[in-house]
Amino acid sequence: MSGFAKLKSWLYKASLFVSLILLIGFSVVLPIDSIAQASKSENNAFNTFIVVGALVVFGVFCIFIIIGRMLFHKSCLKDIPRRYIPITPADLPHRSSREAVLQNMERSKELTILLKKPKDPVIHDGLEPPRRCDYPLDEKLFPEYLNYADCIKSLTDRLKYHGLFLNNLDVRMNLEDTFADVVNSQFVNHNANKIQLEKAKEFIDLYETIRFSGKDVTRDQFIKFVKFCLYFGEVSLTRDTSFANLHNFRLNGSSNNIGRTESKYSINPFDENEYAQDDMHYFPEPPTHLVRESSISTVARHVSSGVDLTNSEEHPLDTDSDCNALRLKLSKADSYRSVIRH
């Protein structure tokens, strides 16, 4: 600020101070003189009432003006954008203050760039971290910001509302059965495999710890839980219960070729041929059973009501003549261009 500008500022402040002193002095003299003159008059009570009433009206009027000015000033401040920073001389005449504002803005920019990527990995329990906060050498197994607890809860929701446990539709359970009861009935009861028994107990303990401990799920717990699900899912797929009633039929090598022609259906839910992709939109979610392939032949035959294989009292098929007889029965049965959904 130049010398002439400083002189103007000092003259303005001095004149304002003198004017305020004179205004206050004359304002104080007037009510005092009015009260003194009223007290000397003959009608003291009436004159005093008039003077005091005038002073009260004047005071109320002054208060009204001051409050109105404050409200007007506040409304003017609201019109200023909140993100506006006063960096111009008209907004902030003090030069040092403007320079401090500009320096802090530059520092904030540097800190933003510096802290955008943390120095060390930041991993919080319960949520999959983004790639920029994760360990750079670890393989990214799950999507970013995946909620571990929601994924685990969906397993019990599918069991509770859909009767589906690890993609196994053959779940015999009661309404009061818990997750542990289902695991015990599927993999513990009547099971002599020590490895499966041990893993089933660990699976139950891990699930109950995650669901009822009240703590966030760690990444290690979630990875271990997913491994257990994959393991027991594979174990469930090896248990084919659809032909349990036909265990008495021991087919030899020639009879195994019955009905094994190239089919237009596949049990691979991730089949990527054009026919499978065309039919995928019919399913609300990836199918867990059979998907069409490119062939137009039949993969299975529907046995009519006249042919009862499950309750057959015949002896097991050991000779070629028995196999030929069975093939003749199947050829006379009704045929469908469909599959048996397991």
Swiss-Prot record:
Sequence intervals crossing the membrane: 16-36, 48-68
Record's bilayer topology term: Multi-pass membrane protein
Primary localisation category: membrane
Segments on the Extracellular face: 37-47
Key words of the record: Membrane, Transmembrane, Transmembrane helix
Changes seen on gene knockout: Sensitivity to 6-azauracil (6AU) and mycophenolic acid (MPA).
Main function: Required for growth under high-pressure and low-temperature conditions.
Protein name from the UniProt record: Defect at low temperature protein 1
Lineage of source species: Eukaryota, Fungi, Dikarya, Ascomycota, Saccharomycotina
Gene assigned in the entry: DLT1
